Each structure stands twice: as C-alpha cells, then as structure tokens.
Amino acid sequence: MSLFPVIVIFGLSFPPIFFELLLSLAIFWLVRRALIPTGIYDFVWHPALFNTALYCCLFYLLSRLFV
C-alpha cells in the first residue's frame, strides 16, 4: 500500500503506482543513455531482455522507497 492517495487529473483517476512507473521509466532512459556509450551492450547476450530486467529492477527499487 502506497502512502500517496489516488490522483485525479481532468476526471481521470490515477493510482500512485502509475507515477512510480513513469518515474522509473524516466530513470531507465537516463541509465540506458549512460550505459550505451560505455559499450556494455556489446557484452549483453540479449539487449531487450537486459533492458526489461533493468527497468524491472529500477521499478522495484523505486517502489520500495515509497512504501
């Protein structure tokens, strides 16, 4: 259960997890842009799977901050 209430914008109600998902997506884009020039994707077997796992880990860490 999150500490934040349901947010209503223009008659649409958004659960708190929606904003955590958006924030983790923004952090994911920043981390990904930082990792691409380092060449780490040359060592990754499946880049799409790596990106999905990275996003899931970031979302988990971010959601643990708001509990």
From Swiss-Prot:
InterPro entries: DUF1656
Alphabetically ordered keywords of this record: Cell membrane, Membrane, Transmembrane, Transmembrane helix
Organism: Cronobacter sakazakii (strain ATCC BAA-894) (Enterobacter sakazakii)
Superkingdom of the source species: Bacteria
Similarity section: Belongs to the AaeX family.
GO cellular-component term (any): plasma membrane
Name of the protein in question: Protein AaeX
Entry's localization field: Cell membrane
Pfam family, one: DUF1656
Main location: membrane
Keyword NAD among record annotations: no
